[in-house]
Amino acid sequence: MAPKDDTVAVTGLTHQERQAVEMLYRAFSEGNPDLLDEAVTEDWQDIPLNPGQQPGREGMKPLIRGFLAAFPDTKIEILEIIGTPGRAAVRAVMTGTHSGEWFGIAPTGRSFRVAIHEFHRIADGKLTHTWHLEDWFGWMNQIGARPVLVEESAG
Protein backbone atom coordinates (compact mmCIF):
# COMPACT_ATOMS: atom_id res chain seq x y z
CA MET A 1 0.00 0.00 0.00
CA ALA A 2 1.51 3.31 -1.00
CA PRO A 3 1.85 5.74 1.86
CA LYS A 4 -0.38 8.77 2.18
CA ASP A 5 1.54 12.03 2.14
CA ASP A 6 -0.04 13.16 5.42
CA THR A 7 0.75 10.01 7.40
CA VAL A 8 4.25 8.94 6.33
CA ALA A 9 7.48 10.76 6.98
CA VAL A 10 9.47 10.92 3.74
CA THR A 11 12.74 12.80 3.63
CA GLY A 12 15.57 13.29 1.18
CA LEU A 13 14.15 11.68 -1.98
CA THR A 14 13.13 13.12 -5.30
CA HIS A 15 9.55 12.48 -6.41
CA GLN A 16 10.80 9.91 -8.95
CA GLU A 17 12.86 8.06 -6.33
CA ARG A 18 9.92 7.98 -3.92
CA GLN A 19 7.64 6.60 -6.64
CA ALA A 20 10.10 3.78 -7.40
CA VAL A 21 10.30 2.81 -3.72
CA GLU A 22 6.53 2.87 -3.27
CA MET A 23 5.97 0.88 -6.48
CA LEU A 24 8.03 -2.04 -5.13
CA TYR A 25 5.67 -2.42 -2.17
CA ARG A 26 2.58 -1.88 -4.31
CA ALA A 27 3.60 -4.93 -6.37
CA PHE A 28 2.93 -7.03 -3.26
CA SER A 29 -0.07 -5.13 -1.87
CA GLU A 30 -1.84 -4.93 -5.22
CA GLY A 31 -0.90 -8.45 -6.27
CA ASN A 32 0.74 -7.21 -9.46
CA PRO A 33 4.33 -8.41 -9.97
CA ASP A 34 4.52 -6.50 -13.27
CA LEU A 35 4.71 -3.26 -11.27
CA LEU A 36 8.33 -4.25 -10.69
CA ASP A 37 9.00 -3.18 -14.29
CA GLU A 38 8.41 0.42 -13.17
CA ALA A 39 10.21 0.09 -9.83
CA VAL A 40 13.45 -1.84 -10.32
CA THR A 41 16.14 -2.29 -12.95
CA GLU A 42 16.26 -5.49 -14.97
CA ASP A 43 19.44 -6.57 -13.15
CA TRP A 44 18.18 -5.40 -9.73
CA GLN A 45 19.93 -7.13 -6.84
CA ASP A 46 17.66 -8.40 -4.06
CA ILE A 47 19.96 -9.20 -1.14
CA PRO A 48 19.77 -11.88 0.13
CA LEU A 49 17.91 -13.93 -2.43
CA ASN A 50 15.07 -16.01 -1.00
CA PRO A 51 15.22 -19.83 -1.28
CA GLY A 52 14.63 -20.76 -4.93
CA GLN A 53 14.62 -17.13 -6.09
CA GLN A 54 16.48 -16.31 -9.29
CA PRO A 55 18.37 -13.00 -9.52
CA GLY A 56 17.04 -9.86 -11.16
CA ARG A 57 13.62 -8.36 -11.64
CA GLU A 58 12.21 -11.42 -13.43
CA GLY A 59 13.43 -13.64 -10.58
CA MET A 60 11.25 -11.75 -8.08
CA LYS A 61 8.00 -12.04 -10.05
CA PRO A 62 7.41 -15.78 -9.37
CA LEU A 63 8.27 -15.18 -5.72
CA ILE A 64 5.58 -12.48 -5.51
CA ARG A 65 3.06 -14.84 -7.13
CA GLY A 66 3.91 -17.58 -4.61
CA PHE A 67 3.79 -15.09 -1.79
CA LEU A 68 0.32 -13.95 -2.85
CA ALA A 69 -0.87 -17.56 -3.05
CA ALA A 70 0.24 -18.03 0.56
CA PHE A 71 -1.00 -14.63 1.75
CA PRO A 72 -3.69 -13.41 -0.68
CA ASP A 73 -4.74 -10.49 1.52
CA THR A 74 -1.22 -9.14 1.99
CA LYS A 75 -0.87 -5.43 2.60
CA ILE A 76 2.37 -3.55 3.14
CA GLU A 77 2.08 -0.23 4.90
CA ILE A 78 5.07 2.05 4.61
CA LEU A 79 5.59 3.82 7.92
CA GLU A 80 8.67 5.86 7.09
CA ILE A 81 11.06 6.50 4.22
CA ILE A 82 14.38 8.18 4.93
CA GLY A 83 16.52 9.05 1.96
CA THR A 84 19.57 10.73 0.59
CA PRO A 85 20.21 11.13 -3.12
CA GLY A 86 20.30 7.62 -4.58
CA ARG A 87 19.53 5.80 -1.32
CA ALA A 88 16.45 5.07 0.78
CA ALA A 89 15.70 3.30 4.05
CA VAL A 90 12.17 1.99 4.56
CA ARG A 91 10.40 1.00 7.74
CA ALA A 92 7.16 -0.84 6.97
CA VAL A 93 4.72 -3.40 8.30
CA MET A 94 3.23 -6.32 6.40
CA THR A 95 -0.12 -7.81 7.38
CA GLY A 96 -2.05 -10.73 6.01
CA THR A 97 -3.51 -14.16 6.61
CA HIS A 98 -1.56 -17.41 6.24
CA SER A 99 -3.83 -19.08 3.65
CA GLY A 100 -1.33 -21.15 1.69
CA GLU A 101 1.94 -23.00 2.26
CA TRP A 102 4.98 -20.82 2.97
CA PHE A 103 8.43 -21.96 4.09
CA GLY A 104 7.01 -25.49 4.06
CA ILE A 105 4.42 -24.57 6.69
CA ALA A 106 0.85 -25.61 5.87
CA PRO A 107 -1.80 -22.87 5.99
CA THR A 108 -2.99 -21.99 9.48
CA GLY A 109 -5.62 -19.37 8.67
CA ARG A 110 -4.01 -17.08 11.24
CA SER A 111 -3.41 -13.41 10.64
CA PHE A 112 -0.02 -11.82 11.17
CA ARG A 113 1.80 -8.50 11.38
CA VAL A 114 5.48 -8.48 10.44
CA ALA A 115 8.04 -5.68 10.63
CA ILE A 116 10.04 -4.94 7.48
CA HIS A 117 13.28 -2.94 7.30
CA GLU A 118 14.85 -2.40 3.89
CA PHE A 119 17.59 -0.34 2.32
CA HIS A 120 17.57 0.59 -1.35
CA ARG A 121 20.05 2.00 -3.83
CA ILE A 122 18.42 4.04 -6.60
CA ALA A 123 19.75 5.20 -10.00
CA ASP A 124 17.89 6.91 -12.82
CA GLY A 125 14.58 6.58 -10.98
CA LYS A 126 14.71 2.82 -10.37
CA LEU A 127 15.93 0.60 -7.56
CA THR A 128 19.22 -1.14 -8.38
CA HIS A 129 19.79 -2.91 -5.05
CA THR A 130 17.62 -3.87 -2.08
CA TRP A 131 18.89 -5.23 1.23
CA HIS A 132 15.94 -6.58 3.17
CA LEU A 133 15.13 -7.91 6.62
CA GLU A 134 11.70 -9.25 7.55
CA ASP A 135 10.78 -10.66 10.96
CA TRP A 136 9.99 -14.21 9.80
CA PHE A 137 10.67 -15.64 13.26
CA GLY A 138 7.96 -13.35 14.64
CA TRP A 139 5.70 -14.51 11.79
CA MET A 140 6.22 -18.16 12.79
CA ASN A 141 5.31 -17.35 16.39
CA GLN A 142 2.17 -15.49 15.32
CA ILE A 143 0.89 -18.36 13.18
CA GLY A 144 1.73 -20.97 15.82
CA ALA A 145 4.61 -22.58 13.97
CA ARG A 146 7.34 -21.85 16.47
CA PRO A 147 10.40 -23.89 15.54
CA VAL A 148 11.58 -26.49 18.02
CA LEU A 149 14.79 -25.43 19.71
CA VAL A 150 17.67 -27.90 19.91
CA GLU A 151 17.45 -27.97 23.71
CA GLU A 152 13.72 -28.80 23.58
CA SER A 153 14.17 -31.63 21.11
CA ALA A 154 17.06 -33.18 23.08
CA GLY A 155 15.10 -33.41 26.34
Positions of PLM-derived features:
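C-terminal and inter-domain tail/linker signature
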Residues: 1-155
